[in-house]
Amino acid sequence: MADYSTKAVWVGGHRGELKCSNGAVVPFSAPAELHGEADVLTPEDAFVGSLNSCFMLMFIWAVERLKIDLESYECEAVGSVQEYLDRTSTFSEITMSPKIVARDCSERDIQRALELAEKYSLIWQSITAEVTLSPEIKILK
């Protein structure tokens, strides 16, 4: 079993630094509308971004395994927050919209790589929000 650790250190105001077990140090803040600062990673962006980046890495792994000639990949992920009467909130849905360009393969090959990426994405398998995948696939000959 693998363990991952981080350390959050307050640096003043509504800012902090996230020190990761791999040595990365990432500044973060509350969202600007919640007394935070603009242009700094927020916990909400990190949550959606962790799914997006993990899914992409697993997709790349699947593409390599299936020997797909990938030309490009980019994915926009949007997390929708549900707010409740008691002022609590949760991510209720995350929509993933990958744009994939590949060469000399079938759309079914890409769909299989997407299925494998979903199955083996640690973050996808760990969250309770509904995840919707809406890929745009282009095959070049």
Explain the meaning of each model-derived region.
Residues 57:
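Active-site-adjacent loop/helix segments that line or gate small-molecule/cofactor pockets in enzymes
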